[in-house]
Each structure stands twice: as C-alpha cells, then as structure tokens.
Amino acid sequence: MTFVMGPALLFCPADRPERFQKAAERADAVILDLEDAVAAPDKQRARGAILAQLGGSGDGPELDPSRTIIRINPAGTEDFEKDLHCLAHTPYRTVMLAKAESVSQLRALPDFHVIALCETAAGVVHAPAIAAEPNVVAMMWGAEDLLASLGGTSSRNDDGGYRAVALHARSAVLLAAGASGKQAVDAVYVNIPDLDGLAAEARDAAASGFGSKACIHPSQVSAVRAAYAPSGEDVAAATELLDAARAAGAGVFQYQGRMIDGPILRHAESVLRRAT
C-alpha cells in the first residue's frame, strides 16, 4: 500500500468525539489519538467513543477509513492490546504506532497499515529496519518525546530552530523511509500561534522530501497545505524546465546558466506532482 494521506494530518484526542467530524473536514486526514492526548483514566472511554461513532444504523462510519489514522499506545503495554481489540471491531486499518522501536513490534500488527512513529533513541537508531517492514507505509519522527527519552529538556534552541540531535533524528527517519520507498511524515510544530514559523518549517519539510506534516490544531492546516502547494511561478518554471529538457534531448544540458541533469529534472517533476 502506498500512503497517500496528506499533506496536512490533524491530531484529534480520541476522547473528544464531538471534534472527530470537524477535524476530518478541516484536514487531509485525521489522527484519532489514543495515546498522549488521552489521560490514562480516560483511555477506555476514548476507545468507546471510536466504537460509538460507527453507529448502529448500518450506514457505516462517519469518518472515511481511507482518511483516518488511529494512534495506538506503545507495543507491550496493556493499552496497546486494548486498542487492538477495539480496532478489530472497526473498519480502520491504518494505525500510527507510538514509540515504535523494533521490527518485532511491527510484526505484531500484521492486519494493519502502520505509520511507525520513531520518537525514542531506540526508534531512531532502528528506523532503517523498521521502515523495511512490509506493513509499514510511512515513518514519522517525534521531537519532544525523543528529547525526553534522552533526559533532555527541549528539542529547540532559543531561536526556535531544532537542536542538533533533533535535526539528526529528523534526517535519519526521513532517510530510512526513503531507502525503503516509504512516505515520511514531519513532526508537529508545538508553538500553535507561530504560524510563520510553522510555514517555514513545513516549506523545509516539503523541499526535503517529507510527504506530509502532522498538525495539532486546526489553525495549522492551511499553513501546511500552502507550504506544500507550489506557487504558480514554481509550476511554470518546472514546466518550462521539463519542456527544455525534452527539446535538448541530452542527458546533461545548460539552461538559464545552470547545468541540468537527471536529479534536477526529478526535482521539477516533484513540483508538478505536488501541484496536482
């Protein structure tokens, strides 16, 4: 399965069913969160909310399974087993495994398409093996949990940029996904009012090869979508470059003072794909 959800994936606490439909309408896909967004005493109620919204009329779920992701609790926990029992009674087959750390954890989910969320040191180190698993459709990294697992206090410097260890993890997960032909999802941007900072980070994510970015608030969706949507000028430039390549009929040619070869042409093709 090729992961095609995105570019804006919106988290929604699974114990807030009144928000499910709105989240799904505002974003390209909704992530119903059974993990960090739900307090331990409320997790069973959250699972019940997922089941309840399916209804008993036979009309099917209110949420489109092809645009719905369920973030489940870490493997090896009691809540992980309860989450799977809940999902067995639903049509939802795309899950995000929190704190994915090993191949064996992914193999415990044979009936699901999995977004492996690497947010611990072990998860980042084992990302290449995790990404290679057949049921893994995408890889995501998490900054704050990663730094917490290392005993750190913040993933970002005072200027808002990521610390070196977070940048390393971001790149490692992206490269692991790419090496196995899987999609990569960029981490959330926790400073909700800072839409300019979010936009800059989302533009970097798109340019670097992340296929989508996770959001924690509906106000972030439009900024992410805009970052992934090439401008008219970008589309025109990419089209002209590809036209020039066809006219040149050569593997390497010069265009507007630049040397153009295969990788540059693939960059242009990527721009046009994002525009469709």
Describe each region flagged by the PLM.
Residues 1-276:
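Expand to "…catalyze enediolate/carbanion chemistry for C-C bond making/breaking, isomerization
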